[in-house]
Amino acid sequence: MATNYIFVTGGVVSSLGKGIAAASLASILEARGLDVTIMKLDPYINVDPGTMSPTQHGEVFVTQDGAETDLDLGHYERFIRTKMTKANNFTSGKIYSEVLRKERRGDYLGATIQVIPHITNEIKARVIEGGKGHDVAIVEVGGTVGDIESLPFLEALRQLAVDVGREKTLFMHLTLVPYIPTAGEVKTKPTQHSVKELLSIGIQPDVLICRSDRMIPANERAKIALFCNVPERAVISLKDVDSIYRIPALLKSQGLDDFVCDRFRLTCKEADLSEWEQVLYQQANPTGEVTIGMVGKYVELPDAYKSVNEALKHAGLKNRLTVNVKYIDSQDVETKGVEVLQGVDAILVPGGFGYRGVEGKIRTAQYARENKIPYLGICLGMQIALIEYARNVAGLTQANSSEFDKHCPQPVVGLITEWQDESGNVETRSDESDLGGTMRLGAQQCHLIEGTKAREVYGTETIVERHRHRYEVNNTLLPQIEAAGLKVSGLSADRKLVEIIEVPNHPWFIAAQFHPEFTSTPRDGHPLFEGFVKAAKEHQGKNA
């Protein structure tokens, strides 16, 4: 069957939740037995978000094949079973880079390179390639209609609708329908103007998703349908909800999936959303709560740790617990002391880059170790735990990472210069390598040592987890640290790189070089986070 395309755009304001809406629709279509994928087209000029500040852009989500992508791809994977790849996210920067590379190579035979047709053709080619082999490909365009940066993408999608046929494409537009308290009613004019903006570039939306803080009355939906030239059944009300996992049922109740299937003439079963009903039941019926102290350097923007936050919630569902996250700036630990860590049931130190706040994280790891508080370290959080143990237990008092001190006399963590990827290829890097796209990225196999807490938590000998880092444990100094009691519980497939460490005489102290949060989902959870949240509850019980 040829691929059907749903193009998702946003209007009026940004941050309306296009990614969540797209993922929710995808989950309903998947529940109807369709093979669905989702793509995100980002208009910014960066080649990828890998070198962007987390406090500006939010987290960088890493796919199985090692793409550094927009955090929306994390939402996609949490809502549907399809795994994202490099084909599921591309930016203006990536498109322009490829077109310029082809021009230098002579592919265009001396033609004058222009936005139309060269840039738009490259966008279309990537969308078609990303949708191959799927029944439905949902394509989300970042930004807001009217932004100059989005124009090449919108023009490419307009052309693509003509190329593949309007019967195989559907334009879904998210808009804001604000409620004005003084008038006591919702206002549809912003939506009308947003659709007018789309029409000016040749796109007639087929479905309107109207975001508001309440359900939009039938008479207002009829008004929107009339003025925006869409069927009344295609005007969908999407109100604010207390859980994003309610949205699939909310969209289904208004017949959005039926409209899509009718449009594409797809014959498929009714959607079974029982898995999502189970998620919502677990969420609504907790038997207790725990507080996790997350000690990081980007805590002013929780989206910088989006997948970690979601993984903690998923672990809460599996343990029937509400998980509260207390964000603690690691610099506050440096200036105010470990008192800021009091009152938490467990401590999590997530990934990060750069020296700022590192000493606060080291003091945090020491506090968790000495006070028997459950600790989960992720990426930098593992390196921090290693440095702390080396300094305070193994006698390597000048231990540090060469990331923070290039002339450190005891570099227990150093730049990784060579490793083997999942395909068996050897990757090499040096201090002179570019920052962008040069880390150890993507899914890697990890061997778990028998008799360790990590092996017990996962319940298997071999796991596959995703990486995003350029520094690793220095094997030269490792024997001295192990002799002091630290346990290596996970190794890379070739047994050369340390992937997991743990403190044996501790209720729950595990730190991993990889990012387990990227593979956690609300339906399946993740064993490492589930074990961590369970340990937090047990610690809470001991201190009650």
UniProtKB/Swiss-Prot annotation:
SUPFAM superfamilies: Class I glutamine amidotransferase-like, P-loop containing nucleoside triphosphate hydrolases. Mg(2+) binds at residues 72, 140. Its EC number is 6.3.4.2. GO terms for biological process: 'de novo' CTP biosynthetic process; pyrimidine nucleobase biosynthetic process. It is an enzyme of class 6 (ligase). Allosterically activated by GTP, when glutamine is the substrate; GTP has no effect on the reaction when ammonia is the substrate. The allosteric effector GTP functions by stabilizing the protein conformation that binds the tetrahedral intermediate(s) formed during glutamine hydrolysis. Inhibited by the product CTP, via allosteric rather than competitive inhibition. CDD domains: CTPS_N, GATase1_CTP_Synthase. It catalyses: UTP + L-glutamine + ATP + H2O = CTP + L-glutamate + ADP + phosphate + 2 H(+); L-glutamine + H2O = L-glutamate + NH4(+); UTP + NH4(+) + ATP = CTP + ADP + phosphate + 2 H(+). Catalyzes the ATP-dependent amination of UTP to CTP with either L-glutamine or ammonia as the source of nitrogen. Regulates intracellular CTP levels through interactions with the four ribonucleotide triphosphates. ATP binds at residues 15-20, 72, 239-241. This is CTP synthase. Pfam families: CTP_synth_N, GATase. Belongs to the CTP synthase family. The gene is pyrG. Homotetramer. Residues 1-266 are annotated as: Amidoligase domain. PROSITE patterns: GATASE_TYPE_1 (PS51273). The lineage of its organism: Bacteria, Pseudomonadati, Pseudomonadota, Gammaproteobacteria, Pasteurellales. UTP binds at residues 14, 187-192, 223. CTP binds at residues 14, 147-149, 187-192, 223. Residues 291-542 form the Glutamine amidotransferase type-1 domain. Pathway: Pyrimidine metabolism; CTP biosynthesis via de novo pathway; CTP from UDP: step 2/2.
